[in-house]
Curated annotation (Swiss-Prot):
One Gene Ontology cellular component annotation held by this UniProt entry: cytoplasm
UniProt xrefs under SUPFAM superfamilies: S-adenosyl-L-methionine-dependent methyltransferases
Source species: Methanothrix thermoacetophila (strain DSM 6194 / JCM 14653 / NBRC 101360 / PT)
Gene: pcm
Enzyme superclass (EC): transferase
Record's protein name: Protein-L-isoaspartate O-methyltransferase
Length: 210
């Protein structure tokens, strides 16, 4: 699928602002070289170490649900190859910042190379257990989780700013994409059914269920 066709198809799902952000990110720089001819197919692609780059429509829908704005500080859990972080970086702009936590060292290095090559300077890749969040920069306006947890990790709730929003898949074989809003209490709404790789960590799964 050509990039133009993919971008046009996304208009069926999300706001024009998200579509424009997606159009500015060169997805071919974030997939393994041998898969570049498939970079603009609307499906997940393997990036190694049992992980995938999410399908473009899913990245777009998660960004739309997050309602990302200029200047926001964002925590991403499950940074993978850096593609989703790049789209969010477009949406928060140069005055915002994305802190992306990834547990696999090789993917952290891959993402850093990809982001540098694509010239994204408002993304920081951090090696660590994403279920613990990243307290050094908390609280966050938005939290995006790109792997499915057994439940919403408590540290992520704590690191979400009052008035903030989190999008997270929850479940094992059957998963729900949840939108979590924090005000005087925590409100959780189901957005849709999804399929993500498991979130591994202290407040996640102990091992893959695939």
């Amino acid at each position: 699928m050509r990039k133009e066709r993919l971008i046009e198809s996304l208009r069926n799902y999300v706001s024009e602002r998200v579509v424009e952000a997606m159009s500015r990110v060169p997805r071919e720089l974030f997939v393994p070289e041998e898969l570049r001819p498939m970079a603009y197919e609307d499906r997940p692609l393997p990036i190694g170490h049992g992980q995938t780059i999410s399908a473009p429509h899913m990245v777009a829908m998660m960004c739309d649900l997050l309602d990302l704005r200029e200047g926001m500080k964002v925590l991403e859990v499950g940074g993978g190859c850096g593609y989703h972080a790049a789209v969010m970086a477009e949406l928060v702009g140069p005055s915002g910042h994305v802190y992306s936590v990834e547990r696999i060292p090789e993917l952290v290095e891959m993402a850093r190379r990809n982001l540098e090559r694509a010239r994204y300077r408002n993304v920081s890749m951090i090696l660590g257990d994403g279920t613990l969040g990243y307290s050094e920069q908390a609280p966050y306006d938005r939290i995006s989780v790109a792997a499915s947890a057994p439940d919403i990790p408590e540290p992520l709730k704590e690191q979400l700013r009052p008035g903030g929003r989190m999008v997270i898949p929850v479940g094992s074989y059957s998963q729900d994409l949840l939108v979590v809003t924090k005000n005087h209490d925590i409100r959780v709404e189901r957005a849709m059914g999804v399929i993500f790789v498991p979130l591994i960590g202290k407040y996640g799964f102990k091992d893959s269920f695939w």
